[in-house]
Amino acid sequence: MGIIKDRFKAKADIASAEIKSIIKDHGNKKVGEVTLAQIYQGMRGITGLVTETSLLDAQEGIRFRGYSIPELQDKLPKAPNGGEPLPEGLFYLMLMNELPTEEQANHITSVWQRRSHVPNHVFATIDALPLSTHPMTMFVVGVMALQTESNFAKQYANGMNKKDYWDATYDDAMDLIARLPRIAAYIYRRKYRNNEHIQPNGLLDWAGNFAHMMGYDDESFKELMRLYMTIHADHEGGNVSAHTTHLVGSALSDPFLSYAAGMNGLAGPLHGLANQEVIKWIFEMQEQLGTDSPTKEQIAQYVQDTLNAGKVVPGYGHAVLRKTDPRFSAQMEFGKKHMPDDKLVNTVWNIYETVPPILQSLGKIKNPWPNVDAHSGALLVHYGFVEYEFYTVLFAVSRALGVMASLCWDRALGSPLERPKSVTTESVKLWLEGKDQIWE
């Protein structure tokens, strides 16, 4: 086995023993109550999952293994002459529950480089789709075509011992993450750049190489990709893409199938399209106002008109967070460093100063602050990356880091098949009348 794989197994064995002890000693303790409203309304607020890689703090935002976004920007290794964290370092942290050294992060880079070869049939499968196909559809089809390379599926078919599930899952996860930038970049160049492809550069890191293969060799764009891939990598386990990947994986579907399922969830408008909606809203505002540099007063009036029309301001509000999303702040700092005079970016900042007070004045909104989606699109547009449909693919490549690290832990800890109980409305009515005990 490899160095990282050996250390991961040792850590997982310790964690597994600890969890078994917790369940043995405290398994009957209740962790909360569930209301009928929660059951009917998306199970929001119900604690029903364990995800080791990240936890959402209402005040500090997402914490990866206990570290906030600002702490990660300070402590994670960076590319030579770079200022943003390497996603390889974040993956190591989520997998190993410890901060990596520069050497360890670079080792992940080299492992992914060695595993990055994509078989020709994957590209042929993508090429068989009409050019008009949505890039997320192409992406998921590409991942499904890559499933032929699954170590887990082959070993399971040959009678693999369940104690070895984690090993094959780890190999699949590393292969999948390594190959995603190649698949995504191929789709980008096929759909938007006349099918003129760029070969990978084996000297670049994972995110830098992704930028290169898409055709962006500006060093600051590579930095943006490193930041983007880091801050979008994980967001607890209850969101649609993470939960779906975990759920499908619990049936012992291999990591390729599980990840593809999760990304079909990410493609949904309520999950992965938010940054597109933000850019669309800003462009509509600029067009209606007849200026690409609206004043704060003009923005305030447009926001009021949006709200009066019964619409929401995209990019603002969060189900849990009660302050400005630190992922927004990280992107804002990137903008100040690399594009302080960009008109669209400055408009995003003016919206940031304008919207929260208006939302607060309504008195109905717990969180009037911007989330991660309020800023990311404007940074991409600065570099001429205006293929908005592809933004979700960027999100998908990033999210692989978190869901694959979690899937490795699921199999290493022997997580069982997920199978919650469901009820009918008729049985609920009988229960309310005291005629049925559906909760027993």
Please report, for each region that a protein language model flagged, where it lies by residue.
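Hydrophobic alpha-helical bundle cores within soluble ligand-binding/oligomerization subdomains
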Residues: M1-E440
